[in-house]
Amino acid sequence: MQTVTAVAHRGDPYRLRENTIASLRSALDRGADAVEIDLRLTRDGVPVLLHDDSLKRLWGHDRPLRSLSAEEVRGLTGGGVPTLADALAATADSRVMVDLPGVRDVRTVRPIMDVIRACGAADRVYYCAGAEAMLAVRAADPAAEIALTWTSLAPPRAALLAAVRPRWLNYRFALVDRELTARVHRDGLLVSVWTPDTARSQRRLLRAGVDSITTNRVDLLHALRER
């Protein structure tokens, strides 16, 4: 049995609306080791689960999140957009991969980390995004676990790796093969990939020796790795 970590991308979005409590719970019930969530801040600084910068795609309201208070978001979505605190409570002791699409500096990451610490979840949360956001995370927390999202076959510069100090390199799955995985492992890092959703692509990545797969089909991945 291969010990690859199965990470549920935004929960279980093929069955339930992404980044909702029901979706996260469904993914964990279907074999996820961890759930990936996207976080943004409301106007009043409350971290909530939302990938986009507005409510339009998922909730039908063409309103930028940054223009709304947490209470207004709750009202517009019928409580459907969870706060980070809600999500941490719902995922109990499971690992949570926090993607930070809206973070650009330390000022915007600190409210997120404050909630994670207040919920006693710092030891089970890790962070992913590009270099700018991960530099902010590292500046805010020297002990944070980081998966640096990387979109090039060329390795990150040594200076960037020294500044971010990631545990993982997080790649789009199509870039990854045995050779890249071996190179990253030689450099002392783990390989995470996103988001293969077919059995064929997941099998290929398992054979390539990756350490973690983030997918919208965590049930499929769970079945494959158990064979």
Protein language model regions, located:
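Phosphate-group recognition and catalysis centered on beta-loop-alpha active-site segments
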Residues: 1-227
